Amino acid sequence: MARMQGCSVLVLDDSDKLVNKYDHKVTVVCSYDPQGMAVRLLQEGATPPKQLEEYLVSGAGTTHLSRGHTSHMLVVGGELVLFRFASRGDCQQFRSLLHKLSGKVNSVFNLRTEDSSASQYFQFYGYLSQQQNMMQDFVRTSTYQRAIYNNAQDFQNKIVLDVGAGSGILSFFAVQAGAAKVYAVEASNMAQYAQQLVSSNNLTDRIIVIAGKIEEIDLPERVDVIISEPMGYMLYNERMLETYLHGKKWLKPDGKMYPSRGDLHVAPFTDEALYMEQYNKANFWMQTEFHGVNLVALRDAAMKEYFRQPIVDTFDIRICMAKSIRHTTNFLTADEKDLHRIQIDVEFHMLETGTCHGLAFWFDVEFAGTCSQIWLSTSPTEPLTHWYQVRCLLQTPIFVKQGQVLSGKVVLAANQRQSYDVEIDLKLEGTMISSSNTLDLKNPYFRYTGAPVAAPPGSNTTSPSEAFWSQLDAQGARNAVNLVNGITVNGLGEVDMSSTIINTNLMAIGGGANGGGPGGHQPNIHPGLISSTGRQQQQQQQQQQQQAAVGPQQQQQQQSTTAQQLAMTPPIGCAATSTQNVAQHQLIGGAISPSLFTSPAQPILNSHHHHPGQPIHGNQFY
């Protein structure tokens, strides 16, 4: 930010003569803006400072002309403005900023990005609500934290670059791990909020916030580590990974990158319900008498449009018909030009017979530190993140048989809208059957509703009804043993639904051994929701008879015990677990916690139970 005081501002009047726009001097403040440079005019002497005018000076839409040693003329938005500075030094400083701005017009970022797309992009990430959306993704944020903490050796007394810092949360993690200095580069207006957080946390000497694009800013020194969260849907969307790779021009030889590698997984899937959902949307245009109008002429165009939309949601991995193909990008060795066109050759050996409706995508990234390797996964087998998973439909599905080979390619072609066109070509080997589709990753269909993921049809190998009643009978038989202890149960045990009957189609909540509360049990149906069987009145009568046969002291003890039990009983409709409120109110990406829909227990930091992203065996994580 640059400030030039004692400046006069002149404009053309109706007779095309230069006249003073204000009857007083102003202070000219120049600051970074995602679209160029913001020039603000402040009234001098006003408390608090009063802004009189603001001009957005962009390299492409602004004409500027020197007028002597102390004056400079701009044409902004059709208005001619002459700045007459108090000194030659102030004028030279202003011209220097304009000169740098003209150089930014041809930056790598601007050459590959439409102005309208960049404007929307930086506006989106300039909202605190969007930063909160990402920060509340527990898996994302905690895995980054764990990766940095577990590899503190890579950060202690090191210089770190945070590319696309946003709120600065990763910069804070780096400092907490011992970093000597962090350059937090952020191109959106979020940079000012990041600066406020740095100042309020008394870290201005260790975190330097730089407002600007990594392709356009200068650093005073090279860095030891680059950290960033550059992943989008299907890993590559938003083309932020190219910016991340561009930052390597500031990385020392043998420097570290967090993350260091990305794997995009591709698998064929079957989902008749999803296919018909999209298909039926287009059938709206089959109407021949819609308020007297025949819509049929647009039906084919509508069908093509709906099937060009990638589907963003989550699913049961059992809908995948073959093992996923993995495409790896090593961030340490890859060049940003490698991401302009990404071709993935696929060959799927089908594991089951059915209709292939398209390809499913998800990604994993690795933090290859000196002390440990941590993985962040968006697989459908892992807790849900704000990246979800992505599915690309074929307008013409392919029927396949177990043992057949489905081959072809997936091409991600980068466009200037900070996204990709996804081209899919598949062929069933040994036949003439093939199908292809081109999708627009910039225009996805956000289908996720927060509902539990349903198992694919045909997943039950036993009768769910018989299993339910068998468990109910078994629990009743076990509780009948209570008769030995003198507890009246009217011939049948009181059925405890909370510990035995767990619907296998619903996933557990929380942090116990079996995904439940402190005791490891999480009920999906609370016993308070089950209507009385008629034995309650008989039990009350027999309890009254028993109380009449005991002394007053024993009655008082029984009443005390009953009161304690009632105090510990959760409200009707609530799960009997102490972790309920924590799990049910924890938000992920502004939506619903993945812990509500996944069977793994909720990770708890700084405990010996679960650490998100920390590998144990194979692809399993704590």
Swiss-Prot record:
It comes from Anopheles gambiae. CDD domains: AdoMet_MTases. One of its GO terms (biological process) is regulation of DNA-templated transcription. Its EC number is 2.1.1.319. It catalyses: L-arginyl-[protein] + 2 S-adenosyl-L-methionine = N(omega),N(omega)-dimethyl-L-arginyl-[protein] + 2 S-adenosyl-L-homocysteine + 2 H(+). GO terms for molecular function: histone H3R17 methyltransferase activity; histone H3R2 methyltransferase activity; histone H3R26 methyltransferase activity; protein-arginine omega-N asymmetric methyltransferase activity; protein-arginine omega-N monomethyltransferase activity. This is Histone-arginine methyltransferase CARMER. Methylates (mono- and asymmetric dimethylation) the guanidino nitrogens of arginyl residues in proteins. May methylate histone H3 at 'Arg-17' and activate transcription via chromatin remodeling. The dimethylated protein is the major form. It comes from the Eukaryota. The gene is CARM1. S-adenosyl-L-methionine binds at Q131, R140, G164, E186, E215, T243. Residues 513-556, 602-622 are annotated as: Disordered.
